[in-house]
């Protein structure tokens, strides 16, 4: 249904399409940088620890902006479109930088630019669709994450065969400028409540931490792990920079199916039961990776893990949308998503980079086991904090 009294261009499908492109840019703008890291390391001698710090800085800026976004007294269009332009420009600046401190600063600013999107875009989709349609809509939205994290590394892998990584990064920045134009045209110009008295009091309880753990577990795989995957396979098993970037791209593509399956399963079986299943699948895949070297079987388990994490992310977003009132969604979404991003996309790559640098290529795979365990802990905490929650959330019991 279109927004009451609003322009027809703000129909749910139009909002979803614009948010899809914005989320594609959110993910691909960062993926284009981390897929360039093996080439950057070969050019400058950058070690895995420095790579982890740069990518951690990228995601730290993202996490801070995700939290701040819901409190800014500016429209969704300005927050999302403006952030897209900022990140496009900082990616170009990153391509021209040479020192690690400069890269750290630029990465943080660029991450902050796209970080403004997540609470605003997710809230727009939640508000545009009825509860029985919401998880499937968010599943389509989550496709953008998989598509962006697939397309950018594949683009980098192909470009490295014919041009320097810096050229690839600058060309990809055009996607962000195009995204800003689409968002400005098709996303509702709503304003988030800001500051004291700017909306309903935030309902902060154990569910916030529980949801942050659930989201952080998924992000640790689909973002944090893939941030370091090109460096892991290049450092640990001697893959070329082009091959490492391409490997990250085509294995990440498996998340496309997981996003759709996650939306369907969350609507049919319920948010919480589907999350438990996805976390158990991630755990099984990660444990299997402990015993494998880079090759076909390794790739299969990476894809299984990616499908499960993408499905879990969709259910997590749907559960978050069901849990909180409309008046508090953008601000609470910002707090939860920022915490989840800090766990999954800052702590994870920094940790993986450190253990890769100091131990071996297999050590990051062992360390990643903490992600699904964290997700399962989040489910337990959520059920404890929501005693009335059974197999489905209150808002989706009428489904199926």
Where are these regions (language model features)?
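Cytoplasmic helix-loop-helix junction between adjacent transmembrane helices
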Residues: 106-144
């Amino acid at each position: 249904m279109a927004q009451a009294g609003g322009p027809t261009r703000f129909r749910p499908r139009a909002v979803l399409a614009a948010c899809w492109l914005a989320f594609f840019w959110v993910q691909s703008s960062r993926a284009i940088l981390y897929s360039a890291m093996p080439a950057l390391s070969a050019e400058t001698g950058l070690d895995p620890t420095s790579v982890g710090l740069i990518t951690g800085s990228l995601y730290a800026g993202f996490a801070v902006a995700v939290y701040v976004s819901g409190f800014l007294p500016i429209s969704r269009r300005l927050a999302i479109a403006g952030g897209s332009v900022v990140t496009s420009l900082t990616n170009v600046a990153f391509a021209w930088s040479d020192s690690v401190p400069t890269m750290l600063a630029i990465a943080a600013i660029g991450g902050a630019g796209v970080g403004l999107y997540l609470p605003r875009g997710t809230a727009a989709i939640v508000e545009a669709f009825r509860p029985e349609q919401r998880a499937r809509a968010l599943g389509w939205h989550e496709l953008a994450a998989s598509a962006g994290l697939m397309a950018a590394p594949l683009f980098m892998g192909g470009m490295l065969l014919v041009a320097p990584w810096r050229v690839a990064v600058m060309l990809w920045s055009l996607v962000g400028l195009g995204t800003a134009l689409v968002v400005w045209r098709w996303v509702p110009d709503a304003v988030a409540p800001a500051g004291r008295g700017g909306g309903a009091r935030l309902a902060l309880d154990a569910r916030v931490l529980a949801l942050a753990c659930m989201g952080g577990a998924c992000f640790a795989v689909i973002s944090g792990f893939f941030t370091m995957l090109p460096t892991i396979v290049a450092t640990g098993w001697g893959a070329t920079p082009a091959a490492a970037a391409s490997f990250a791209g085509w294995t990440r593509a498996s998340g496309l199916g997981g996003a759709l399956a996650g939306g369907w399963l969350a609507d049919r079986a319920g948010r919480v039961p589907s999350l438990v299943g996805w976390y158990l699948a991630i755990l099984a895949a990660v444990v299997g990776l402990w015993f494998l070297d880079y090759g076909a079987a390794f790739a299969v388990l990476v894809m299984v893990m990616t499908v499960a994490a993408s499905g879990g992310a969709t259910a997590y977003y749907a559960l978050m949308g069901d849990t909180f009132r409309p008046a508090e969604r953008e601000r609470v979404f910002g707090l939860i998503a920022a915490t989840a991003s800090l766990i999954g996309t800052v702590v994870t790559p920094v940790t993986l980079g450190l253990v890769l640098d100091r131990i071996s290529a297999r050590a990051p795979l062992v360390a990643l086991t903490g992600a699904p365990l964290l997700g399962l802990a989040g489910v337990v905490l959520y059920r404890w904090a929501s005693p009335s929650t059974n197999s489905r959330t209150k808002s989706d019991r009428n489904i199926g």
